[in-house]
Amino acid sequence: MPIKVPFRAMWLLEISHLTKSYARPGGNGGRHRVVDIAAFALAPGAQVALRGESGTGKTTFLNLLAGIVAADGGSIRLDGRELTALGEAGRDRLRAGTIGYIFQGFNLLQGHTVLENVELGMAFGRGVDRGRAAALLQRVGLADKHRHYPRQLSAGQQQRVAVARALANQPKLVLADEPTGNLDRRNAREALDLIREVCRESGAALLLVSHDERVLAAFEDMRDFAGLNRALSTTAS
């Protein structure tokens, strides 16, 4: 039977029959399907965690939602717009105005200060607002580090910068890819609490992927990515 998404007057994110494949290594001409998702939906302001081990397509899935990579087929409807109908420039604009992304491994620019890294989260959206960037650093407890460079910060502090940058463009959806993977237990707990709190405060929905059961246990709405992604149980041609 086809998987149906329950009716909701307005979803922030709606996915239908989303697929992505890559060429198999070795040049044999075959394709390896990484993502094959029949249906998924996320309400405004929702906080959902996806459980999945490394190599299961979680990062590719988030990159599809962010428009960083193009889908092979299917539909991604984000904030009322069809993402898959847009070219690369259109996807970039939609991402800049709608999505915040907390990358695995922080992904901070080492040649820029902490404040500049946060401002870069605004650069392709509504324009740089230094006052907002400073306020975000205040919110994540790094106001006194605004002139520092990422290499001068601890791992926990770098993750806080990444959180501030993700919120810089006032997103409606925050994507978080293994956001605690490089942190010790204490910093992981603090980072997770911070991410969830700032999303609640701003009204942004949160979609987080992780394999850490301690992280996943914090979410009332936790789903198994292996059950969602049919590519893990089928062989693509």
Segment roles from a protein language model:
Residues F219-A236:
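H-loop (His-switch) and adjacent beta-strand-loop-beta switch element
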Residues M1-S21, L232-S237:
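ABC-family P-loop ATPase nucleotide-binding domain
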